[in-house]
Amino acid sequence: MEKKSPRLKALLTPGEVAKRSGVAVSALHFYESKGLITSIRNSGNQRRYKRDVLRYVAIIKIAQRIGIPLATIGDAFGILPEGHTLSAKEWKQLSSQWREELDRRIHTLVALRDELDGCIGCGCLSRSDCPLRNPGDRLGEHGTGARLLEDD
């Protein structure tokens, strides 16, 4: 007797999505409150998610890992048709929007790393600009923070 392959469920419970995606059910509800994902309600008023939500949650997790704010993720999702399953080509276009920001962050982190050798332990990254060693710090007149590292 031949076994039939189990048919994939069209709709998933929040618990199933949480288990498959590795995020808490509360995170799913939060993402939904921010408009990043959508659910439908069954006759018992319980949330159910279409299977494509797994891909969207994966994208959210990736974007958050690289520091992309949820609002930016939402803007990117906003240009996609609702209920649309993202293709590899569309993912490439979507991720390219974030690449420039990621490159800028990498550049800043590399600059910070390279300046650490000059740190004297006071939290400042440059002895020549340190207000303790250089009370007349000219950069301080232009504002607070890492003035040499910030892009204006």
Swiss-Prot record:
DNA-binding region listed in the record: 14-33
Keyword Metal-binding: yes
Function (record text): Activates the transcription of the soxS gene which itself controls the superoxide response regulon. SoxR contains a 2Fe-2S iron-sulfur cluster that may act as a redox sensor system that recognizes superoxide. The variable redox state of the Fe-S cluster is employed in vivo to modulate the transcriptional activity of SoxR in response to specific types of oxidative stress.
InterPro entries for this protein: DNA-bd_dom_put_sf, MerR-type_HTH_dom, MerR_fam, Redox-sen_tscrpt-act_SoxR, Tscrpt_reg_MerR_DNA-bd
Binding site for [2Fe-2S] cluster: 119, 122, 124, 130
Residues covered by the HTH merR-type domain: 11-79
Protein name: Redox-sensitive transcriptional activator SoxR
Upper classification of the organism: Bacteria, Pseudomonadati, Pseudomonadota, Gammaproteobacteria, Enterobacterales
Annotated NCBIfam families: SoxR
Residue ranges of the region described as Might be part of a sensor region: 119-130
Coiled coil: none
PROSITE patterns documented for this protein: HTH_MERR_1, HTH_MERR_2
Organism of this sequence: Salmonella typhimurium (strain LT2 / SGSC1412 / ATCC 700720)
Alphabetized UniProt keyword annotations: 2Fe-2S, Activator, DNA-binding, Iron, Iron-sulfur, Metal-binding, Transcription, Transcription regulation
GO biological process, one term: response to oxidative stress
Family annotation (CDD domains): HTH_SoxR
GO terms for MF: 2 iron, 2 sulfur cluster binding; DNA binding; DNA-binding transcription factor activity; metal ion binding
Subunit-structure text: Homodimer.
